[in-house]
Every structure is written in C-alpha cells, then in structure tokens.
Amino acid sequence: MTTESRLTFYHSPNTRSTAALILLEELGAPFELKVLDMKAGEQRQPAYLVINPMGKVPALVHDGALITEQPAVFIYLADLFPDAGLAPPIGDPLRGPYLRWMVFYGSCFEPAVIDRSMQREPAAMSTSPYGDYDMMLSPLTEQLAKGPY
C-alpha cells in the first residue's frame, strides 16, 4: 500500500466488524476508524447509508472504493498488504483453495453456526446454501485434519 492511500474503516463494537478491526491492527495498517453506535441506529442514518446502502458493518473505503462483507474485507486486506504473507498471490496454485475457504466462511460456516446456535432448522436441502450443519462441518473437519496450519 502506498503512503498516499487512505483507508477508512466503519466499525461497531460487538459485531462481526471486530475481526476486520483486529486484522487491520495486526497488519499495522494506517486507517481512520469510524465507530457507529448501532443501538442508536447510526447505521440507518442517511450519512452512513451513503457509505453502505445496506447499513451494515464492516465497511472499508480505500481511496473511494467500498469493500463490504467480512470475507471480502479479509481478502482485500490480505492482498493490499502482501508482505504480511496472509494470502497466496494471484497465479499461485494455492490461491484457489484459499479463496474457497475464505468464501466458505461467509456462505456456509457462519450461516450454519448461526442457525445451530439459534436452534433454527436449516432450509430444505434443495434451497440451503450449506445443506445442514453436519454437511457443512464434514469438509471443514477433513481439511483441518490434514494440518499443519
């Protein structure tokens, strides 16, 4: 990242944006932190909806470009700070599996864990993005068993 680049990070405590905030801090990234009070509804105010029309966090703005969705922010930051060694570079054969597991988090793992923790039945197998909890956990467990990581 060049010294002229500018990162602005929109965060609310006790939300999924906390992981992205920790990543920014661990990377030593220069960024401006904007904290939203979601209990007061700041994420639904016109000033923030101009930034992120969905009114969600995390939101990262880099030189005017908006990045939302936690896995996208993680991937973007890993690519923006390649010296940290968090992601295989484009062209590396490991890039595909890396992207698979980064996207798996938001599209399969998190929805399955939330449904399980809230004691909700998953959607029908034909419409569920992850099948059911055990179906989601099986490939993850198999991958982690290969270790080390």
Model-found features: residue ranges?
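The first long alpha-helix at the start of the GST-like C-terminal all-alpha domain
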Residues: 83-120
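Short clusters of hydrophobic/aromatic residues that line enzyme substrate/ligand-binding pockets
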Residues: 48, 86-88, 149
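Residues that scaffold the ATP/ADP-binding catalytic core of kinase and kinase-like folds
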Residues: 51, 76, 112
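GST-like fold's C-terminal all-alpha helical module
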Residues: 105-149
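A basic- and aromatic-enriched beta-loop-alpha substructure that forms the phosphate/nucleotide-
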Residues: 71-82
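N-terminal G-site of the GST-like fold
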Residues: 1-71, 94, 124-129
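Alpha-helical elements of Rossmann-like donor-binding domains used by nucleotide-donor carbohydrate transfer enzymes
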Residues: 72, 97-100, 135, 139
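Active-site phosphate/pyrophosphate- and oxyanion-stabilizing loops and adjacent acidic/basic residues
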Residues: 21, 75, 138
